[in-house]
């Protein structure tokens, strides 16, 4: 692949998505030598360049075709798409898949002493947020007029600082809200990390590399959601035992040496095998039950 056809991937330079994005790429076999002082890193084993930038720059870089792929939170992507649509700028991209990290929600929250009944209680109040476009769309859908206070960070302190009456901010556990005397009232947007691709037409070799990376990501995510189960089972309760294995494909059943009344079962389960399920398996005569994580899956 020529230098101009190297795959360019944008990730957050630092923050909650940066570590997980790099970890995922590493799990896919992509090796980078990251220098914290440099914004561009070159893969050691694939024709891939990594651009480490501010998260709110990533959607625009993808939509403008500057980079080919981007790891981004859906909340940032949605906010930027609304902004670009209002300015008649390119706002299209291909969402290849959601990822299993970066889950959060964009919520309205008010001080503990606020007399909140429903969303209409926010009529005419000042709301601090870093997501004015998503907030505006939600409030317009509800038919509620309000005043906004745009902040780039520390939104949760705005009411105590006298800057706003309420806030619209990202929430993960709610602990930050509680620490600042606030409580969550409405969830207006659910978000997780996702992988997006530019709509720019790609050369065949670059698109093949994108497909390879996506296939590996699918395998890594699927493996994390799956477990490999091994156990010994009596032949007389085999059907009942197989039925108990959660989300399992057709298991492999193997004979045991010198024991015609028992078999070995190997299965991949796409759901958690809880303790109560293992206890039920034991009651049906299963033994030597092993539940192991899977590092990679394909096919």
From Swiss-Prot:
Q: Does the keyword Isomerase apply?
A: no
Which EC numbers does the record give?
A: 2.4.2.17
Q: Which cofactor does it need?
A: Mg(2+)
Q: Which InterPro entries match?
A: ATP-PRT_HisG_long, ATP_PRibTrfase_cat, ATP_PRibTrfase_CS, ATP_PRibTrfase_HisG, HisG_C, N-reg_PII-like_a/b, N-reg_PII/ATP_PRibTrfase_C
What protein name applies here?
A: ATP phosphoribosyltransferase
Q: Which UniProt keywords apply?
A: Amino-acid biosynthesis, ATP-binding, Cytoplasm, Glycosyltransferase, Histidine biosynthesis, Magnesium, Metal-binding, Nucleotide-binding, Transferase
Q: Which SUPFAM superfamilies match?
A: GlnB-like, Periplasmic binding protein-like II
The chemistry this enzyme catalyses reads: 1-(5-phospho-beta-D-ribosyl)-ATP + diphosphate = 5-phospho-alpha-D-ribose 1-diphosphate + ATP
Family membership, please give it: Belongs to the ATP phosphoribosyltransferase family. Long subfamily.
Keyword Glycosyltransferase in annotation: yes
Q: In which pathway does it act?
A: Amino-acid biosynthesis; L-histidine biosynthesis; L-histidine from 5-phospho-alpha-D-ribose 1-diphosphate: step 1/9
Cell location: Cytoplasm
Spell out the GO cellular component terms annotated for this protein, sorted alphabetically and separated by semicolons.
Answer: cytoplasm
Q: What is the annotated role of this protein in its UniProt record?
A: Catalyzes the condensation of ATP and 5-phosphoribose 1-diphosphate to form N'-(5'-phosphoribosyl)-ATP (PR-ATP). Has a crucial role in the pathway because the rate of histidine biosynthesis seems to be controlled primarily by regulation of HisG enzymatic activity.
Care to name a GO molecular-function term for this sequence? Answer: magnesium ion binding
* Enzyme class (EC, first level): transferase
GO annotation terms (biological process): L-histidine biosynthetic process
Report activity regulation: Feedback inhibited by histidine.
